[in-house]
Design a protein with these regions (language model features):
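Short, surface-exposed ligand-recognition loops at beta-strand->loop->(often short) alpha-helix junctions
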Residues: 15-19, 109-110, 190-196
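Amphipathic alpha-helical segments
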Residues: 20-32, 115-122, 196-207
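Proline/glycine-anchored alpha-helix kink/cap motifs
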Residues: 10, 14, 26-27, 89-92, ...
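Structural motif
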Residues: 8, 97-99
């Protein structure tokens, strides 16, 4: 089990936008890159656009701009919330007022269950494992992802949602970066902040998530991206 846990790595950053069109404009203006079409998530009633941000330190990593799909309705059971706090009215109001925001990150592992158990041993409830998918021109992307019934991010987004791509035991599961071209953007660092930084450090160690900076502060994350215009920092809004 420890070998599986030690392979946990950053998979993607999550930027929430009020609409995908606004998210695309934000990305083009701030980062100098137009995000490519992603797809729809029928279970959650959301859709996305993607940008490759892979780097030497963070290989096979991308930025996801996500928004509610106006042409879809969440298929979650009554009372269950969408992922990434997307049903939180306070977060929604912040995004409407201030524009697209970095709100979270997702970490991948070959088996999501041991990582969930490791966090659970620290009193951190990841919720349930949900099987999800979306069609692409290259075929069906499939994954298993942790989602709480209340949709909340762990520690205000400072700890990742966990994802396992493909079917269990699949040797080379399909991943979005396999079809995302080089964008000129590279993830250089992630800073995780929380009033209890020792809990963040223990959680990262428990799931084998290396390369994170941890500081005492308001719950959230800050990502540093190398762009063709220089370094750009994205910070999550106050939680």
């Amino acid at each position: 089990m420890n070998q599986q846990i030690l392979r946990t790595t950053v998979d993607h950053l999550v930027v929430l936008a009020s609409t995908l069109e606004e998210g695309a404009r934000w990305c083009t203006h701030l980062l100098g890159v137009t995000p490519l079409p992603g797809g729809q998530h029928p279970l959650m009633g959301t859709h996305n656009r993607l940008v490759n941000i892979s780097s030497f330190a963070y290989p096979d990593t991308y930025l996801e701009i996500i928004a509610l799909d106006p042409e879809a309705i969440s298929q979650r059971a009554p009372g269950l919330k969408r992922w990434f706090d997307m049903d939180d009215p306070v977060l929604h109001a912040q995004v409407v007022r201030d524009g697209p925001q970095l709100i979270h990150f997702v970490a991948r592992c070959p088996d999501v269950l041991p990582a969930m158990q490791a966090l659970g041993a620290l009193g951190l409830d990841c919720g349930q494992v949900i099987k999800a998918s979306r069609p692409t021109p290259e075929g069906l992307l499939q994954w298993r992802i942790t989602v709480r019934d209340d949709g909340q991010r762990l520690l205000g987004g400072a700890l990742p949602t966990l994802i396992q791509w493909g079917e269990p035991g699949e040797a080379e599961p399909a991943h979005p970066t396999q079809t995302l071209p080089y964008s000129g953007l590279q993830l250089q660092g992630l800073l995780l902040t929380n009033p209890t930084p020792e809990l963040i450090e223990s959680a990262c160690e428990a799931i084998g998530l290396a390369g994170m900076q941890v500081q005492n502060g308001t719950p959230g994350i800050r990502a540093t991206l190398q762009t063709e215009r220089g370094l750009v920092q994205l910070s999550s809004p106050p939680h």
